[in-house]
Every structure is written in C-alpha cells, then in structure tokens.
C-alpha cells in the first residue's frame, strides 16, 4: 500500500516512522509519500491561503496548490479530506481502506478549505466532535488504524482480529504476571487451561464491557441466542 499525504507540515509525520509502522516502512510493507502543497504555489511568497470572500476571521486554503499537488500524483487511489463535518472514522472504514492499493489524505489548516476542494475528495472524514489546529493528527490516527491491519505489520496476525471493534464488541480484559497483585487476582478461568471456557469468558466479558461502556454498539448488533443469554446474566449480575 502507498499512502500519499498532502500537508503543509510533513515533519509532523515522523511518529509514523517508528515502532511497528516504522518497521513496516523499512520492510516495504507500505509506503508513505509526504507532499508539501506549498511547493505547488506560483507566487514569490508561496501563499497557500487567502482571506475569505464575504469577509470573516481567519484565512482559507486555496484550491490551486492542492489541485496541482493532487495532479502530480500518479496513483492517488481514494482521496480523503479530514474535516469536522465528515463522517466519523471507525474500525470498519480502516478495514475497508486497508484493502486499497493507494490512499491520499489532504490535511487542512488555518480557517479551513475553499469549499471547492471538497469536490476533489472521495470522502470527508472526522475523528470526533472537536476541532484541532490542522488535519495532520487525525490523518496520522487514521493511517495508524489502517496500516496496522496490513499483513506483516503486527507480530501476531491474530491481534487485529481479536481487538476492540473488530467483531462489533469492545475487547475483553487481559492480564499477565503476576497472578496475584496485592490481593487482586487473575480470574481463575484464565489459568485453567480450558480453552473453551476461556473463549466463553472472553466473549462474555467483551459483551459486558460493551454493555457498560458503549451500549450504542449493541443497538446495531444482531445478538445470537448465546449472547442474549450472556447479556441477561450480565444485567442480573449488575443489579445484584
């Protein structure tokens, strides 16, 4: 996979070059192409923004440098703009994007984009109901969530499958040594060696976490008979 990023601040993307994603870059499992669209301006001062028509505070990013930067790419793939009005990014989107050969992100800054820039994109995406100074941090979050799903990026291929949201539930609690820390003990089932019981416990605890912390996720989920039984047990245990 090749990911292009149009940004005024390419140095902000250094964190993607460390840890597992960084090793993936070194091993050529994915490619990151940072494009500073200031390089595509035509005036001597390299302006990328201007005052808004109709007046108002702030500066608006111009379409021409961004359009020229996009046109310079040989393989754009899906073009994504990060903006507060976009649909909220989620794990399903990361899974879909991870199947693409090319992705291109456009990072905004200042007051925002000239409205015509949105017509250059296939999707407008947000990471939440809050405003940041630019689109670089949301873009890095989405790249991380997407690239980690590529084959060979994570050491354990089962990891992305078992994590939160992958099956529409939050992740079950996890423990490691010591088995007893100041009286707080690891659930006995996890040390029993009974893989079926462990799987059942994890499923129920994932359901419990989702019910307690993200009940909205259950509203869209078609529960199996076993999950309905587990959920009734969870509700009963909560009441008691």
UniProtKB/Swiss-Prot annotation:
EC number of this enzyme: 2.1.1.228
Catalytic activity: guanosine(37) in tRNA + S-adenosyl-L-methionine = N(1)-methylguanosine(37) in tRNA + S-adenosyl-L-homocysteine + H(+)
Annotated compartments: Cytoplasm
SUPFAM superfamilies registered for this protein in UniProt: alpha/beta knot
Broad EC category: transferase
Name of a matching Pfam family: tRNA_m1G_MT
Gene Ontology terms describing biological process: tRNA N1-guanine methylation
Cysteine disulfide links: none
Claim: Cytoplasm is one of the keywords in the record: yes
Major place of residence: cytoplasm
Binding site for S-adenosyl-L-methionine: 108, 127-132
Keywords: Cytoplasm, Methyltransferase, S-adenosyl-L-methionine, Transferase, tRNA processing
Superkingdom of source: Bacteria
tRNA processing in keyword set: yes
Quaternary assembly: Homodimer.
Function in brief: Specifically methylates guanosine-37 in various tRNAs.
PANTHER family named among the record's database cross-references: TRNA (GUANINE-N(1)-)-METHYLTRANSFERASE
Protein family according to the UniProt entry: Belongs to the RNA methyltransferase TrmD family.
NCBIfam families reported for this sequence: PRK00026.1, trmD
Protein name: tRNA (guanine-N(1)-)-methyltransferase
UniProt source species: Lactobacillus johnsonii (strain CNCM I-12250 / La1 / NCC 533)
Annotated gene: trmD
């Amino acid at each position: 996979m090749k990911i292009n990023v149009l940004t005024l601040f390419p140095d902000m993307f250094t964190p993607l070059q460390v840890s597992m994603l960084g090793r993936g870059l070194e091993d050529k499992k994915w490619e990151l192409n940072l494009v500073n669209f200031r390089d595509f301006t035509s005036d001597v001062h390299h302006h990328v923004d201007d005052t808004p028509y109709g007046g108002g505070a702030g500066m608006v990013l111009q379409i021409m440098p961004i359009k020229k930067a996009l046109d310079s790419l040989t393989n754009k793939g899906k073009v994504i703009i990060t903006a507060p009005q976009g649909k909220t990014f989620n794990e399903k989107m990361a899974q879909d994007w991870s199947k693409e050969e090319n992705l291109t992100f456009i990072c905004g800054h200042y007051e925002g984009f000239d409205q015509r820039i949105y017509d250059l994109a296939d999707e407008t995406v947000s990471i939440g109901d809050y405003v940041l100074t630019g689109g670089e941090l949301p873009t890095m979050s989405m790249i991380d969530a997407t690239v980690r799903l590529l084959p060979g990026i994570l050491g354990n291929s089962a990891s992305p499958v078992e994590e939160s949201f992958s099956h529409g539930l939050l992740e079950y609690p996890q423990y490691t040594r010591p088995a007893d820390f100041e009286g707080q003990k690891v659930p006995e089932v996890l040390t029993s060696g009974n893989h079926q019981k462990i799987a059942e416990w994890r499923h129920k605890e994932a359901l419990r976490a989702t019910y307690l912390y993200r009940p909205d996720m259950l509203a869209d989920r078609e529960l199996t008979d076993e999950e309905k039984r587990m959920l009734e047990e969870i509700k009963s245990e909560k009441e008691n």
